[in-house]
């Protein structure tokens, strides 16, 4: 068994920056979003199933998934969203477990944007939340993705609240300041997680 630290935060909170800082310290990072993209790569069985269910227009000329079209299709249709989740979630879970087993670092950092929404925090040994104010989320996301304030507000409304994320947190990184301020927080937490992982391994041994 591997000690799992789940990392989460709302859109624009800086999850990638924090994850990269842990990766720089030699920690294996398992990213749920990357795995979600991998299971629908061209040629993947799940992609064929999506085309069969939603129609061939969901697949671009180069064989990739038309993500925006799919998002628009399921956004206002809970039944279709449930169908898609039932298809993809087991595949994502299977690949996640595979990557955890392949990990070589003392603990793994599991990056899960929808950790709270999908109650996945129960699968982790510890939860780290990257916390920023909603206003910071708005500004960063508008700048990064070149989208309107209204668009970001819709995304925020669909995600778990800041309070809900903080309620499941064991550790919190305040990322309202400059990005380079994160390094010291990550170094401190890394030392703590190494200790916890070591204790976890010694308890696991028969």
UniProtKB/Swiss-Prot annotation:
Enzyme class, UniProt record, top EC level: transferase
DPCK domain boundaries: 4-200
Residue sites binding ATP per the record: 12-17, 144, 175-177
Main location: cytoplasm
Function: Catalyzes the phosphorylation of the 3'-hydroxyl group of dephosphocoenzyme A to form coenzyme A.
Subunit structure: Monomer. Forms homotrimers in the presence of sulfate. The trimeric form exists in solution in equilibrium with the monomeric form.
Official protein name in the record: Dephospho-CoA kinase
Organism expressing this protein natively: Escherichia coli (strain K12)
């Amino acid at each position: 068994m591997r000690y799992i630290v789940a990392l989460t935060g709302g859109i624009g909170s800086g999850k990638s920056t924090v994850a990269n800082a842990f990766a720089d310290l030699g920690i294996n990072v398992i990213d749920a979003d990357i795995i979600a993209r991998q299971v629908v790569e061209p040629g993947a069985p799940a992609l064929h199933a999506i085309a069969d269910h939603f129609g061939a227009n969901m697949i671009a000329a180069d064989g990739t998934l038309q993500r925006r079209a799919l998002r628009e299709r399921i956004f206002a249709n809970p039944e279709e969203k449930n169908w898609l989740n039932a298809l993809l979630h087991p595949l994502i879970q299977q690949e996640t477990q595979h990557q955890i087993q392949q990990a070589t670092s003392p603990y793994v950092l599991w990056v899960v944007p929808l950790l709270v929404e999908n109650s996945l925090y129960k699968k982790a040994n510890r939860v780290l939340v990257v916390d920023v104010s909603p206003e910071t989320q708005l500004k960063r996301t508008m700048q990064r993705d070149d989208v309107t304030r209204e668009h970001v507000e819709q995304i925020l409304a669909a995600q778990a609240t800041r309070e809900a994320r903080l309620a499941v947190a064991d550790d919190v990184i305040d990322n309202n300041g400059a990005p380079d301020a994160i390094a010291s927080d990550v170094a401190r937490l890394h030392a703590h997680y190494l200790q916890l992982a070591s204790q976890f391994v010694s308890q696991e041994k028969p």
